[in-house]
């Protein structure tokens, strides 16, 4: 492909509101164009990357025994109402009506539709196991789209669905898909952690995420370098501390004027934050719930969501605190006798002794309080150096970008949708399902996040839009241009993917653009061409080697073969 004819336009200007490196470089390099918030077009060069990613994913899915199909984008509401997700999925679900006033949604995921297809066709155990997948566009009305392709409202995804006769067979299908996912990420040269995850809106029995470490990811993960444990922080169980109760001290009522935060209280009373009970009042479906936690800990509202079984809860407003407890925020305490307020106590307060606690009296706290709590749950945010639940070693905590997600669904969809089969004894049973997603367009961003420097992208060879870039330094120089033409034809005839920069622009522009778009190998045809030499530059190592013109073809073929063409 000749750059002068290629639909590729880079820009020198720094794009606005591009925090993530992938968003910045993909925009500057002309790979993506924003249409609206969270909605992007892929230009031809990005489309080449996309297709290479798809082909790797497709190859591993096919090897795993999955069969490709294509489902619809427009889903009738009736299917989603069968599983209860029409309402449960929330505002992220794009809903619309047709001219006959029938309800539809733009599919964010396809458990309902694939289950409907299978229940219409699968009747016998002889038709199972079955694994079906598609690569298709999805839609989610993200509240806050950001970081370019990392978090959009329209995106391309591979979703697969397995159907089995029983739990054992379903687990086997799940393990096969997990292996396929590991192969995919290895072939993409992505550094990935497989972590235990919450089942979320998809539902089911268990799940895992495949996460790339980056500060622009929405997932917060905890991992142990000692035993290999890794999980989303929201499902890491922080156990009760191994502490003994202290001998009780005399309870004191202390004046704490306008002291409303844990930090202020700790400083004012000269006590550790771990010796303070923090009381937080939530409202869930008009019902007040008080959550107690140690002062040095934070509440993980994702854990609360799992505990409550809904995300429909919020912090109490000032007027609600006044009405329910006759106090103000900062002085809320767990003394609610005669009030219809549920109390939830975090594990961190197990055997807590001689604590500082508010008691619903403005500007006062108790010191040396000893409260006998009976029931404890884990609702604390995981923090760096918290003990690993498997081996007790200190945990590491990092942000991560979810690239793949696998779910062992069980009968979450087959039961309500009556997707039944008849077993060998003639007994009708629900199929046991799994589902498996990979964010295809998000992978483009993830690759750039892991492969870039200050100048631009450094594509791994398996997904690079082109394998080789030929930069003709001076297109007006007959020797340089004819040499570039010769190399372009020689390489393309060998099936090597080449972008020939034949533009009539300055060498500086060509070199800057070459670094920006990140093609793995660059052949620089400059002044040395008259001496029979060109320069071959490795974009990853920046190593430059002079190669005789008549040896370039063999040299390129050798490095492509060595590096996994």
Curated annotation (Swiss-Prot):
Annotated GO MF terms: aminoacyl-tRNA deacylase activity; ATP binding; proline-tRNA ligase activity
Major localization listed first in the record, in broad terms: cytoplasm
Biological processes, Gene Ontology terms: prolyl-tRNA aminoacylation
Keywords associated with the record: Aminoacyl-tRNA synthetase, ATP-binding, Cytoplasm, Ligase, Nucleotide-binding, Protein biosynthesis
An annotated GO cellular component: cytosol
Catalytic activity, as annotated: tRNA(Pro) + L-proline + ATP = L-prolyl-tRNA(Pro) + AMP + diphosphate
SUPFAM superfamilies on file: Class II aaRS ABD-related, Class II aaRS and biotin synthetases, YbaK/ProRS associated domain
Subunit structure: Homodimer.
Notes concerning its domains: Consists of three domains: the N-terminal catalytic domain, the editing domain and the C-terminal anticodon-binding domain.
UniProt-listed PANTHER family: MITOCHONDRIAL RIBOSOME PROTEIN L39/PROLYL-TRNA LIGASE FAMILY MEMBER (PTHR42753), PROLINE--TRNA LIGASE (PTHR42753:SF2)
Protein name per the record: Proline--tRNA ligase
